[in-house]
């Protein structure tokens, strides 16, 4: 054998040696300490010496045989080296990563996640995470459109879409994106008013910044995709911060007053509309009632006119009596004897006559029959006049 079998002294004073001439009893030195793994070059050298020595001594020490044994030893060493080189070429790409492979320094391909192999010392690779969301922050003092200075901060979230372009299209893609973000933000802020930046225009500024940033990175073709842009803060310089806070508070009060006024309008407008409709309907009803009453009075006087023409005195007296009755019905009445020099005589006519409601009912019934009484009086007068004329005619005829 090329080395001693266990238990075979073979002139080694009872020591068991491994192929490299080390003591094989428990893998320890005589002192009892662990020897540790040997150096790879030292292993190859010792193995070559052992194999060369064994094969060189074979056949009585012939030079040709010794030369063949050395070649075999070097072949074994080469096979071991190749095996080590092959195993060293295996590598693993993570699930969220992609590997960019360079062959002799030149881009060759992109490998997918999993176990891959490359020829060691010929191909090199670099793994890039293409699923992680990365973030960078841009901030600083910026000049607005109305020549004011404002401090703005914005966060940009992005991810890698093309690993090769991310690594080799520009020198440093992250730094290039930071500069592009700062440039886009300054361009948008420079085209906006300070009041809009601090209050209502934040959403518009965020959208405009994202659109401008996409245009810039598309022109650079860096292999990055913008996921989101967040407008973190915008504040005026400390020297004028109090004045801007007052302006913002006044604007908020204005908006609050407007909302309260709108709420009051929404509350009172339906009520006012309903009241207006009610008053309009009442006015229409009053108009119809007054018109009908006037038309009734006109019709009544039109019917009364022939009677008045037939008996003016009687009709006039009757109208006067009805009018006075209507007037005195709604007034308090006191009777006083003005010629008496004694005590004042007070007669409560209203209480004596009864309730005022009964008087009103009586007045209304009398008023409604006024025309009938006048017509009867007129007919009676006409009859008396006719009888008088007949008697006068008979008297004159008797005389003749």
UniProtKB/Swiss-Prot annotation:
<comment type="similarity">
    <text>Belongs to the band 7/mec-2 family. HflK subfamily.</text>
</comment>
<dbReference type="InterPro" id="IPR001972">
    <property type="entry name" value="Stomatin_HflK_fam"/>
</dbReference>
<feature type="region of interest" description="Disordered">
    <location>
        <begin position="355"/>
        <end position="400"/>
    </location>
</feature>
<feature type="transmembrane region" description="Helical">
    <location>
        <begin position="70"/>
        <end position="90"/>
    </location>
</feature>
<comment type="subunit">
    <text>HflC and HflK may interact to form a multimeric complex.</text>
</comment>
<keyword id="KW-0812">Transmembrane</keyword>
<dbReference type="GO" id="GO:0016020">
    <property type="term" value="C:membrane"/>
</dbReference>
<keyword id="KW-1133">Transmembrane helix</keyword>
<dbReference type="Pfam" id="PF01145">
    <property type="entry name" value="Band_7"/>
</dbReference>
<feature type="compositionally biased region" description="Low complexity">
    <location>
        <begin position="1"/>
        <end position="27"/>
    </location>
</feature>
<dbReference type="InterPro" id="IPR036013">
    <property type="entry name" value="Band_7/SPFH_dom_sf"/>
</dbReference>
<feature type="compositionally biased region" description="Basic and acidic residues">
    <location>
        <begin position="374"/>
        <end position="383"/>
    </location>
</feature>
<dbReference type="InterPro" id="IPR001107">
    <property type="entry name" value="Band_7"/>
</dbReference>
<dbReference type="InterPro" id="IPR020980">
    <property type="entry name" value="Membrane_HflK_N"/>
</dbReference>
<protein>
    <recommendedName>
        <fullName>Protein HflK</fullName>
    </recommendedName>
</protein>
<feature type="region of interest" description="Disordered">
    <location>
        <begin position="1"/>
        <end position="43"/>
    </location>
</feature>
<dbReference type="InterPro" id="IPR010201">
    <property type="entry name" value="HflK"/>
</dbReference>
<dbReference type="InterPro" id="IPR050710">
    <property type="entry name" value="Band7/mec-2_domain"/>
</dbReference>
<dbReference type="Pfam" id="PF12221">
    <property type="entry name" value="HflK_N"/>
</dbReference>
<feature type="compositionally biased region" description="Polar residues">
    <location>
        <begin position="384"/>
        <end position="400"/>
    </location>
</feature>
<comment type="function">
    <text>HflC and HflK could encode or regulate a protease.</text>
</comment>
<keyword id="KW-0472">Membrane</keyword>
């Amino acid at each position: 054998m090329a080395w001693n079998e266990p238990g075979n002294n073979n002139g080694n004073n009872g020591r068991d040696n491994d192929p490299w001439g080390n003591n094989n009893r428990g893998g320890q030195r005589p002192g009892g300490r662990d020897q540790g793994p040997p150096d790879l070059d030292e292993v190859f050298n010792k193995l070559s010496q052992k194999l060369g020595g064994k094969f060189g001594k074979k056949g009585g020490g012939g030079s040709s045989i010794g030369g063949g044994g050395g070649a075999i030893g070097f072949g074994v060493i080469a096979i071991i080296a190749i095996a080590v080189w092959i195993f060293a070429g295996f590598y693993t790409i993570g699930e969220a990563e992609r590997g960019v492979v360079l062959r002799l320094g030149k881009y060759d391909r992109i490998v997918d996640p999993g176990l891959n192999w490359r020829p060691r010392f010929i191909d090199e690779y670099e793994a890039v995470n293409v699923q992680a969301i990365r973030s960078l922050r841009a901030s600083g003092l910026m000049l607005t459109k109305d020549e004011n200075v404002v401090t703005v901060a914005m966060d940009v979230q992005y991810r890698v879409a093309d690993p090769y372009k991310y690594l080799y299209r520009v020198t440093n893609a992250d730094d290039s994106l930071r500069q592009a973000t700062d440039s886009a933000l300054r361009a948008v802020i420079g085209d906006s008013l300070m009041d809009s930046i601090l209050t209502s225009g934040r959403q518009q500024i965020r959208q405009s910044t994202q659109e401008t940033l996409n245009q810039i990175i598309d022109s650079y073709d860096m292999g990055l995709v913008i996921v989101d842009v967040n407008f973190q803060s915008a504040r005026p310089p400390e020297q004028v911060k109090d004045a801007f806070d007052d302006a913002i508070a006044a604007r908020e009060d204005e908006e609050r007053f407007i909302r309260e006024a709108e709420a009051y309008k929404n509350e009172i407008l339906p009520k006012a509309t309903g009241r207006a409709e009610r008053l309009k309907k009442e006015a229409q009803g009053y108009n119809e009632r007054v018109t009908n009453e006037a038309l009734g009075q006109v019709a009544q006087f039109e019917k009364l006119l022939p009677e008045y023409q037939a008996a003016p005195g009687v009709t006039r007296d009757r109208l006067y009596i009805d009018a006075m009755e209507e007037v005195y019905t709604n007034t308090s009445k006191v009777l006083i004897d003005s010629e008496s020099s004694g005590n004042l005589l007070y007669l409560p006519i209203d209480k004596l006559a009864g309730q005022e409601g009964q008087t009103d009912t009586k007045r209304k019934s009398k008023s409604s029959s006024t025309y009938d009484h006048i017509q009867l009086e007129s007919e009676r007068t006409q009859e008396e006049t006719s009888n008088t004329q007949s008697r006068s005619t008979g008297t004159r005829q008797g005389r003749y």
